[in-house]
Amino acid sequence: MSLKEKLIEKVHTEEHPHAHNKITVVGVGAVGMACAISILMKDLADELALVDVMEDKLKGEMLDLQHGSLFLKTPKIVSGKDYAVTAHSKLVIITAGARQQEGESRLNLVQRNVNIFKFIIPNVVKYSPDCKLLVVSNPVDILTYVAWKISGFPKHRVIGSGCNLDSARFRHLMGERLHINPLSCHGWIVGEHGDSSVPVWSGVNVAGVSLKSLHPEMGADGDKENWKDVHKQVVESAYEVIKLKGYTSWAIGLSVADLAETVMKNLRRVHPVSTMVKGMHGIKDDVFLSVPCVLGYSGITDVVKMTLKPEEEDKLKKSADTLWGIEKELQF
């Protein structure tokens, strides 16, 4: 009789138990691991799977997390190059791909990452045909479209992390100016995650008080307080962080865990995430852009119809045209 048998009396043998709330992170770079630790610390999964092509790094990251098991409430952390480890995932987060270099635009990464997605997506779909896909790799709007095309999933199950982080950055900067917690500062950035994102100045408020009604020049060129600069800082923030530390990780990891929480707990919170916007705001092509979406267990269940000023709508359309110009040239 082994020590284990002497110590423990078996009551019931489970038949092939598999996780009920499994999350997979594809790509264990700085962003993937920031997503992983943020998800672990929010107790969102009963199993976490990590996948990457770099086997040593992958095993090292898995072991490092497993060694912290005592301090976490996710009983199973697995990893592998083979996508079989991802089977039965409820949510699959894709962070793999070529990374933005200093000064490089997100759009420049496109074809490099399309080729990577051609391998990843079919493997994810094979083992978790009912999962929700959350795309984080840049350029996120285009790669969410690519993931949708390759997966064959209905559009409500393919979500791009989109402007969830841009809006969070905006609210942080707004909070700094007003000396108010960002949770109480409301403002939305929509459109492309990146250089052509659109700040919806008309909706910016604190406690339901429209800031533009108090300060009509807000967001305009002639504004003495130069609020436009807040949006400029949002656009430049990733470039600044990349210049200083080489990559971004913590904020996007926290932002992704925020989205994962809404999905896994069926919270039906509204987030600015990338979804198919054809037919909205005069957009006629199969473009993915961020608009306010209700998220829950089945993915994106609803879209909030924003009231946009004509110039905001024009910017959104222009964003869509830019993205479609690139999407229609892609080689699948």
Swiss-Prot record:
Keyword Cytoplasm (UniProt): yes
Pfam families from the UniProt entry: Ldh_1_C, Ldh_1_N
Top-tier EC class: oxidoreductase
Cited PROSITE patterns: L_LDH
GO molecular function annotations of the record: L-lactate dehydrogenase activity
Record keywords: Cytoplasm, NAD, Oxidoreductase
EC numbers: 1.1.1.27
Binding site for NAD(+): 29-57, 99, 138
Residue positions binding substrate: R106, N138, R169, T248
Presence of the UniProt keyword Transmembrane helix in the record: no
CDD domains assigned to the protein according to its UniProt record, in alphabetical order: LDH_1 (cd05293)
Active site per database record: H193
Record-linked InterPro entries: L-lactate/malate_DH, L-lactate_DH, L-lactate_DH_AS, Lactate/malate_DH_C, Lactate/malate_DH_N, Lactate_DH/Glyco_Ohase_4_C, NAD(P)-bd_dom_sf
Main localization (coarse): cytoplasm
Assigned GO CC terms: cytoplasm
GO biological process: lactate metabolic process
UniProt xrefs under SUPFAM superfamilies: LDH C-terminal domain-like, NAD(P)-binding Rossmann-fold domains
Subcellular location: Cytoplasm
Pathway: Fermentation; pyruvate fermentation to lactate; (S)-lactate from pyruvate: step 1/1
Catalytic activity: (S)-lactate + NAD(+) = pyruvate + NADH + H(+)
Function: Interconverts simultaneously and stereospecifically pyruvate and lactate with concomitant interconversion of NADH and NAD(+).
UniProt subunit comment: Homotetramer.
Family, as annotated: Belongs to the LDH/MDH superfamily. LDH family.
Protein name: L-lactate dehydrogenase A chain
Species the sequence originates in: Sceloporus undulatus (Eastern fence lizard)
